[in-house]
From Swiss-Prot:
UniProt main location, coarse: mitochondrion
Gene name of the record: YEA6
InterPro entries to which the protein is assigned, alphabetical: Mit_carrier (IPR002067), Mitochondrial_sb/sol_carrier (IPR018108), Mt_carrier_dom_sf (IPR023395), SLC25A32-like (IPR044712)
GO molecular function: NAD transmembrane transporter activity
Transmembrane segments: 42-62, 104-124, 142-162, 198-218, 247-267, 298-318
Classification of source organism: Eukaryota, Fungi, Dikarya, Ascomycota, Saccharomycotina
Organism, scientific name: Saccharomyces cerevisiae (strain ATCC 204508 / S288c)
Gene Ontology biological process terms, A to Z: mitochondrial NAD transmembrane transport; NAD transmembrane transport
UniProt repeat feature Solcar, residue ranges: 36-128, 136-225, 241-329
Subcellular location: Mitochondrion inner membrane
Similarity remark: Belongs to the mitochondrial carrier (TC 2.A.29) family.
The protein, known as: Mitochondrial nicotinamide adenine dinucleotide transporter 2
Amino acid sequence: MNNGDNKTTLENSKNASLANGNYAIPTKLNRLKKNADPRVAAISGALSGALSAMLVCPFDVAKTRLQAQGLQNMTHQSQHYKGFFGTFATIFKDEGAAGLYKGLQPTVLGYIPTLMIYFSVYDFCRKYSVDIFPHSPFLSNASSAITAGAISTVATNPIWVVKTRLMLQTGIGKYSTHYKGTIDTFRKIIQQEGAKALYAGLVPALLGMLNVAIQFPLYENLKIRFGYSESTDVSTDVTSSNFQKLILASMLSKMVASTVTYPHEILRTRMQLKSDLPNTVQRHLLPLIKITYRQEGFAGFYSGFATNLVRTVPAAVVTLVSFEYSKKYLTTFFQ
């Protein structure tokens, strides 16, 4: 067989693979990935975490207030926030611009280690999961995403509990300024509720691994379908269609994952805040699901969903794009 026939056969094989959804990573590329410097994923994750935290904080405050409001309604408190724009307007009117950045410190402290751990574990697992699932990229990416998500969630859950408490402080009434910063919040939660309270919402957070199990395999799949190149030439890359392909893959994968898994965020937020509901209801998943459905119906599990999409989709784009380009730059830097 001549070189032309070889090339045609290779192209046909590649096209057939793509059509069938088989995106097995070539052996040579596997070896290169396995020899990659672990510092690259860790530092890239930390940088993307810092950028994401600063971007999402105002949206996170609005989302958290809307999610928590459903629990306040169950305890017969008045409804203070109405819709996405109404929530922003109310926070700005009552608390000023600073109100939109409540919890920024724990958000930054949370995002940096979360994404640093997540991407380090995810990259590490992907190096070896392709050998375990050589013909199923979905299972390879999903198992890596779930493992990384579980480890980072358990490691950083206390920070997110603190962040939720700080974001819910309005300076008015029941949610007045009870906590005076990150360290003070940690101290008061441990003193008043015990260290166990720092792991409130861990079960629904772990159930939220479904989010990354959908998002990251879909993200990797879309990158391939859109023809995204893993080239490390950063200078020309950002001006090419490669950059647009990465943005589109980030957006679509996050929108799908968020739509499917949003109810777990509602439950996690409500388990993490303080309320007048008995602990047997608020701190346990099934009773909380029942009372949420009874009081608010199915819509209660999607309270603040529009705000969440406005927050998570741009955050996913910033996170993944900054991670990919940091990784490209650092790969050449550490060579």
